[in-house]
Structure formats: C-alpha cells, structure tokens
A protein has these predicted regions:
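Active-site rim recognition segments
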Residues: 20, 184-209
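Short, basic, helix/turn surface patches
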Residues: 105-110, 176-193
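C-terminal, active-site-flanking charged/polar segments
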Residues: 149-150, 169-184, 200-204
C-alpha cells in the first residue's frame, strides 16, 4: 500500500468475527436513523430501536431512554426486525407510569418521583414502528401499545407468531418445542395473537429499492405522525 505521496506504508488488518461485524452494522444503522429523525424533526423527536425483548436490550432501552428522549417532545420506538423475548411489561412500566402525588422538600429541590421508581420513565407521546419481521413478544408489545392506546403504530402488520412454548429433550439428543400457552388480545373479540399479526394504524411498505437508496418510508411516516403529536 502506498501513501498519497507515493511512499510504501504498512497496513495491519485485523479480521472481525461475524458477530462483532453484525453488532457494528446494527449500531451504525441505529445511529443513522436516530440522526435522520433528529435532523428532520429539528430536534423535536427522539428515536431508539429495541433489538430484542430480553434483558440486554431492556437495560439498553432504559439507558437510551434518557439519551434519546432528552429535550424531545415525542419518542419513536422501533421494534421492527425484533425477534421477541419476554420483556414487554417491563418496557411498558417505563412508558405508562403516572404520578400519584407530588412532594415539597424542605428547602426546595427535587422530590417525588425521584428515587421511587424501579426504571426510568417516559410519559410524553410515543410512536411505535413495527413490521412483518416483528415476532412474538415484539408483537405482544405492539398489540399492548395499540390496545392501551399509548400511541399510534406505523409500518407493516406483524408476523403473527405469538405463543408460549417450552421444550423437551428426546432420547437421540434432539429437542422438541411444545406450545403450552396461547396469547389473546384483551379486546372485545379476544383476538388470538397466533396467526393474527398486529395491524399498524398507518400502513407503510418499504419498497425493494429503498434500502440501496438509504430510504426508509416507514420512518418518514413515523416522523410525520410524531410531529403531528407535538403540542
């Protein structure tokens, strides 16, 4: 390898494991989407993506809740391409907390609810993005946001793969998965979440050529919906 001046130079290339490469690509994409949201909305909207509904992503969500939401009026929460897990109710506990009292400390300063809540909270408007690659607990989260009227959903109908399963080992060493609990929406019809994906309030499809052009039509719509919620 030569330098711009034409002199030879030595370059050391360290290969990355596939997992580290995927993680880096994920972080880069989330950063670009966050920058797009903040730039397009002139700082009014925040953005964060939940990669999975498990403990690492839950802790990351709480951490990013402060960074993404600081000074913002509306938060875009993205569960597209989220394979699921089990943390919906913990995420909801950060998004649906109401103050039941107020305090007046001696000498002024902060009071309730500081130090009283398990998780950080966000009580301003939210817009949730979901798509056909949102599975299982990510679908339960989407249904919960819709059923509890916490905010509008944007994107595509979720996959419709919601059921609790366990497993049993066989004599040959293989494992068989077994369903043991069905999930139903707490609505008038008691909709079975299995085979019934959560329909968004604003259906938007990203076209095949959009990725090459770095265009995200679903995010564009979510930004417009979010701006309409700014007071």
């Amino acid at each position: 390898v030569t330098s711009p001046a034409g002199e030879p130079r030595e370059v050391l290339i360290r290969p990355s494991a596939s997992g580290a490469l995927r993680s880096g690509m994920y972080d880069r994409r989330e950063r670009l989407l966050r920058e797009q949201v903040e730039s397009t909305s002139e700082g009014k909207l925040g953005y964060l993506h939940i990669q999975a509904m498990g403990t690492p992503s839950l802790l990351e969500f709480e951490r990013k809740l402060y960074a993404a939401g600081h000074g913002k009026d509306v938060l875009l929460i993205d569960v597209r391409d989220n394979g699921g897990g089990w943390t919906t109710d913990m995420v909801l506990s950060m998004l649906m907390v109401e103050d039941h009292a107020f305090t007046i400390p001696r000498g002024g300063g902060t009071g309730y609810p500081q130090g009283r809540r398990i998780f950080g909270t966000w009580d301003k408007p939210v817009v949730v993005l979901c798509n056909e690659n949102s599975y299982s607990n990510a679908e339960i989260f989407s249904w919960a946001i819709k059923t509890l009227k916490r905010g509008p959903l944007v994107g595509k109908k979720t996959f419709g793969a919601v059921i609790s399963t366990g497993g049993a080992g066989l004599l040959d060493g293989s494992l068989i998965r077994m369903p043991f609990r069905g999930w139903y929406v707490n609505n008038r019809d008691g909709t079975n979440m299995e085979l019934n994906g959560c329909p968004p309030d604003h259906a938007v499809e990203n076209l095949p050529g959009d990725y090459v052009l770095s265009r995200d039509r679903q995010l564009e719509k979510a930004i417009n919906v979010g701006l309409s919620l700014v007071e």
